[in-house]
């Protein structure tokens, strides 16, 4: 039986959930405060890393391999290339690298262990601690995030039973009745509602839930590599961990994109979403950190800097699914890692919205029971 689903949000979780619902024959309305896709969505950027290896976590590693396969299927569905399979390199202590490569193999992935010498020989344009090794994955790489979102919308526009409502902020959600009120007074009625608005979630959730979400602000540098290093960078995989104390990571320039640099040291907790400009302090901090990692790197490489926001569930530091009542849910926090798992998350959410038992995807926040806004411990707050 066809359901009427309202999806609030214009980022990757909202759009892929809409895709999954449409594929199942349901009627879907997507509404967002900005354009669709929303250029201020957490997921709107040049690129994101897709890697399988999650050290010492075989369950999540297996889930990431499934996500890899689903992204390949989505390229075929949308008839759009947005997944550059350049591999992924995770720099680790030698013992952890050996364990990681073995775990990936056991999970059905393809990876090899690199020694410190092999790492230095293969990537001379990276300065990695000489005592570290690495795991190099094959079934991994870079998702061209903006292209992903555009492909979702392009596909949805050609489907029956889909309505996209842009530039209409949502002021209230009544999950029990399936109604969503817009800023212009219009009320959308449906059988199920999903709120997936990333860092704006706190404004649409009960205070007791909103108070358990942490807002993060991350600074990012976008760079042009020197011409004499272009060949080396063209053969560089995505690097989710460079093995530094500060948690530095990078995305190589692929398909006309910039080299993206950032670090855990450039992520901080903030109270509100304000501007997106990178303060000179944070830019200099990142420039100094990467000056020790990339030979020859300096401010002249940097062509742009920006800040982005995301939310996490304070209790776990990860994502959060909230049951709003009726057939209403909120994917209220991404935890900073949701993009690569978005196809799996969308499948689980679509199942819940349309009355099916949710697919088990290997992610605890989605496989377990959601946080219930009507639970006594929340209702009493």
Language model segments and positions:
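Beta1/beta-strand and adjacent pyrophosphate-binding region of the FAD-binding site
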Residues: 1-13, 29
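Short hydrophobic core segments
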Residues: 6-8, 31, 187-200, 346
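Active-site substrate-recognition segment that forms the wall
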Residues: 19-23, 81-83, 199-326
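Glycine-rich FAD pyrophosphate-binding loop
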Residues: 22-43
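Dinucleotide-binding Rossmann-like beta1-alpha1 core, especially the glycine-rich loop
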Residues: 47-122, 247, 270
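Flavin (FAD/FMN) cofactor-binding and adjacent substrate-gating region
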Residues: 91-159, 163-166, 172-174, 313
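Conserved beta-strand-loop-beta-strand element in the redox core of flavoprotein oxidoreductases
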Residues: 171-188
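C-terminal catalytic lobe of FAD-dependent flavoproteins
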Residues: 295-381
């Amino acid at each position: 039986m066809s359901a009427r689903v309202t999806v609030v949000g214009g980022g990757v979780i909202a759009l892929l959930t809409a895709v999954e619902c449409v594929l199942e024959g349901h009627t879907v309305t997507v509404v967002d405060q900005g354009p669709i896709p929303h250029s201020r969505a957490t997921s709107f950027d040049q690129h994101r890393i897709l890697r399988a290896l999650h050290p010492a976590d075989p369950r999540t590693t297996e889930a990431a391999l499934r996500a890899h396969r689903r992204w390949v299927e989505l390229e075929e569905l949308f008839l759009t290339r947005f997944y550059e399979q350049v591999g992924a390199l995770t720099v680790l202590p030698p013992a952890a690298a050996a364990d990681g490569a073995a775990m990936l193999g056991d999970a059905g992935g393809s990876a090899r262990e690199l020694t410190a010498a092999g790492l230095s020989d293969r990537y001379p344009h990276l300065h990695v601690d000489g005592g570290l090794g690495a795991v190099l994955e094959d079934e991994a790489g870079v998702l061209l995030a903006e292209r992903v979102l555009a492909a979702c919308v392009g596909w949805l526009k050609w489907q029956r039973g889909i309505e996209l409502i842009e530039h209409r902020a949502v002021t209230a959600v009544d999950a029990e009745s399936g109604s969503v009120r817009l800023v212009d007074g219009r009320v959308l009625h449906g059988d199920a509602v999903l709120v997936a608005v990333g860092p704006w979630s706190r404004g649409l959730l009960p205070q007791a839930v909103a108070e358990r979400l942490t807002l993060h602000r991350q600074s990012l540098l976008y760079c042009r590599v020197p011409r004499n290093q272009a060949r080396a960078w063209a053969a560089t995989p995505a690097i989710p961990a460079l093995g530094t104390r500060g948690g530095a990571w990078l995305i190589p320039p692929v398909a006309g994109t910039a080299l993206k640099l950032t670090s855990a040291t450039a992520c901080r907790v903030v109270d509100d979403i304000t501007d997106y400009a990178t303060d000179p302090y944070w830019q200099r901090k990142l420039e100094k950190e990467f000056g020790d990692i990339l030979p020859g790197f300096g401010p002249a490489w940097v062509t742009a800097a920006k800040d982005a926001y995301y939310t996490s569930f304070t209790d776990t530091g990860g994502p959060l699914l909230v049951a709003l009542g009726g057939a209403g849910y909120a994917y209220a926090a991404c935890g900073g890692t949701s993009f690569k798992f978005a196809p799996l998350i969308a499948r689980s959410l679509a199942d819940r919205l349309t009355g099916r038992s949710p697919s088990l995807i290997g992610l605890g926040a989605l496989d377990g029971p959601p946080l219930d806004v009507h639970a006594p411990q929340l209702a009493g707050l």
